[in-house]
């Protein structure tokens, strides 16, 4: 048994080497032999775990420690099949002669939790994240419903072997999708919404690939000129210069008000004990400098 057990299992085998009472240990292959019986049980996270940072993980006692495993523990603990190994023992606690342990399965009948994630989109997002970044995240939302279709954080971890990641210097247990970031181009729809509400949608900007505000140069991606763009074209091409000019027309108070209404600067609570970082949204009065506001 020893070569096919985990380190924790090997320690248990050593501790129990002279034990007479039945005990359980996890092994990686069928090693049925005299006095040992193997039973196949489903892995909680499957052979290729997905969305580990969002789902979280369990401790050695089967209690949720992080992510949805912790936030929804009361609900999740009552779902799924429950396996019990029943042994007939004598007065000394030894397995009775001529008997074998019996695996008894029962189903709680509870329905569990269904997420909005798409398995295919999640798997694709995780593959792209691993291939293109050392540290970061990819979020995919359904534009029509705002349902989260993918929530990938990299580097990731194996929820079946969390101990291997506990002291890793790149902090794989952190869900980077829930951290605070400089918003970048994600903020452009906020400016567009504020402009639509204020009736200021007529701005046309001849983009040379950059914009100068108080002597500070703000470039479009790669410094590529977009030419003459209106609001729709600026959104399509993600023109930095256009939205800097639009923000100047709207003013910091109007822009900040729309950002607050759309949820910027506050945490999003997804479940008990599971929230995103709030981030920081500066007060309008701190943006008196045109350069600071543009940034």
Predicted features by range, described:
Residues 2-110:
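Small/polar-residue-rich segments within soluble enzyme cores
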Residues 27-34, 125-133, 195:
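Alpha-helix C-terminal capping segments
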Residues 36-37, 131-143:
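Short N-terminal helix-loop-first-beta-strand/juxtamembrane motif that initiates sensory/input modules
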Residues 44-48, 107, 131-132, 142, ...:
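Extracellular/periplasmic catalytic domains that process cell-envelope and extracellular macromolecules
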Residues 48, 52, 56, 66, ...:
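Solvent-exposed, polar/charged alpha-helical surfaces in well-ordered, non-transmembrane soluble domains
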Residues 86, 136-139, 149:
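Generic short beta-strand
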Residues 92-93, 97-101, 142-185, 190-295:
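Beta-lactam-recognizing serine transpeptidase/beta-lactamase-like catalytic domain environment
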Residues 96-136:
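Conserved, well-ordered alpha-helix/loop/beta-strand core segments that scaffold catalytic motifs
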């Amino acid at each position: 048994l020893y070569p096919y057990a985990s380190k924790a299992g090997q320690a248990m085998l050593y501790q129990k080497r002279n034990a007479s009472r039945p005990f359980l240990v996890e092994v990686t292959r069928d090693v049925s032999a005299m006095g040992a019986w193997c039973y196949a049980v489903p892995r909680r996270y499957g052979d290729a775990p997905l969305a580990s940072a969002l789902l979280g993980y369990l401790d050695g006692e089967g209690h949720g420690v992080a992510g949805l495993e912790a936030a929804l523990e009361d609900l999740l603990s009552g779902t799924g099949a429950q396996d019990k190994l029943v042994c007939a023992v004598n007065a000394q606690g030894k397995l009775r002669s001529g008997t074998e342990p019996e695996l008894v399965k029962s189903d709680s009948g509870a329905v569990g939790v269904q997420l909005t994630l798409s398995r295919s989109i999640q798997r694709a997002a995780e593959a792209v994240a691993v291939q293109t970044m050392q540290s970061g995240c990819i979020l995919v939302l359904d534009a029509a419903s705002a349902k989260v279709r993918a929530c990938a954080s990299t580097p990731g971890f194996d929820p079946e072997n969390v101990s291997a990641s506990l002291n890793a210097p790149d902090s794989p247990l952190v869900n980077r999708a829930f951290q605070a970031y400089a918003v970048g181009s994600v903020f452009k729809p906020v400016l567009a919404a504020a402009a639509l509400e204020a009736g200021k949608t007529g701005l046309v900007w001849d983009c040379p690939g950059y914009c100068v505000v108080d002597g500070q140069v703000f470039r479009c991606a790669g410094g590529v000129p977009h030419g003459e763009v209106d609001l729709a074209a600026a959104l399509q091409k993600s023109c930095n210069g256009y939205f800097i000019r639009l923000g100047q027309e709207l003013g910091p108070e109007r822009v900040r008000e729309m950002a607050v209404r759309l949820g910027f600067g506050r945490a999003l609570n997804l479940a008990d004990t599971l929230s995103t970082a709030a981030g920081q949204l500066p007060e309008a009065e701190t943006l008196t400098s045109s350069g600071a506001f543009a940034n």
